[in-house]
Amino acid sequence: MDKPASRHFSVLIIDDEPQVTSELRELLENSGYRCVTSTHRESAIASFQADPNIGLVICDLYLGQDNGIRLIESLKEVAGNGRFFESIILTGHDGRQEVIEAMRVGAADYYQKPVAPQELLHGLERLESRLHERVRSQLSLSHVNQRLEYLAESLNSIYRDIHKIKYEVHGNSQPSALRSEDSQPSAPPAPVAESQVSPSNPLFGKLSPRQQAVARLVSKGLTNYQIAYELGITENTVKLYVSQVLRLMHMHNRTQLALALSPAAMQQGSGAVVH
């Protein structure tokens, strides 16, 4: 009879009895599995790290001084979140507590020695199907995440374009700092440097950097649309900042804020200190 086609995942067989690993290896290789064997913890972990195709692990519960359940936990730590594998625990003892502990750490199945060959093969096939499904789900999730990232970037680009159009419509298509006084006859006087604004009102220094930035732009006569464009935030966020600034500076409207941060107010504040 022809040997079955090779499987996608390799099997790591761990048992401190070489005869057991040899018999299991022969059984599984005759069923199309590629096998890696180990008789102790250190070599098992090294083999698992060296071969990313290992997706199925058969491990004896007692490995001399080592414990198969603890070894499965170590393999999970090595695998991390980016690698999947399914594990089977073998034991020559009938212990309910060991079964519970094995299931708790993530072992998928539990067999008593001597294991019926066909029962073990059927169990491996079930786990192999489950592993394929987990990998497919992970790939599908990764693809969805990539599409969401692309969609988010596209939406951000559209949002920036809309903001730019709004700014050009409401702001006469020129940055606020470049508008001439002739084109804006009702605009307040030319803005003062940021370092000059702060001393004019002691409450100004208590604002956060973002609140100060919004306050300065309000004092220059910019609309919420224009401030949003300047700072790269939404208009609703601008409204929230303006409300916070007015409350923290004990003012009732934007006009009071603009007057408080005007060059004249700054000069008065300086004159109060220097005589």
Curated annotation (Swiss-Prot):
GO terms for biological process: positive regulation of cell adhesion; positive regulation of single-species biofilm formation on inanimate substrate; regulation of DNA-templated transcription. The keyword Phosphoprotein applies. One of its GO terms (molecular function) is phosphorelay response regulator activity. Residues 224-243 bind DNA. Residues 10-128 form the Response regulatory domain. Residues 173-205 are annotated as: Disordered. Residues 200-265 form the HTH luxR-type domain. InterPro entries: CheY-like_superfamily, Sig_transdc_resp-reg_C-effctor, Sig_transdc_resp-reg_receiver, Tscrpt_reg_LuxR_C, WalR-like, WH-like_DNA-bd_sf. Disruption phenotype: Expression of flp in response to carbon starvation stress is completely eliminated in the deletion mutant. The keyword Transit peptide does not apply. The modification 4-aspartylphosphate is found at residue 60. Signal peptide: none annotated. Induction: By carbon starvation. This increased expression is controlled by RpoS. Changing residue 60 to A: No change in transcriptional regulatory activity. It comes from the Bacteria. Keywords: DNA-binding, Phosphoprotein, Transcription, Transcription regulation, Two-component regulatory system. Phosphorylated by PprA. Member of the two-component regulatory system PprA/PprB involved in biofilm formation by controlling the expression of many related genes including type IVb pili major subunit flp pilin, adhesin bapA or cupE fimbriae. Functions as a transcription regulator by direct binding to promoter regions. Negatively regulates its own transcription. This is Two-component response regulator PprB. It comes from Pseudomonas aeruginosa (strain ATCC 15692 / DSM 22644 / CIP 104116 / JCM 14847 / LMG 12228 / 1C / PRS 101 / PAO1).
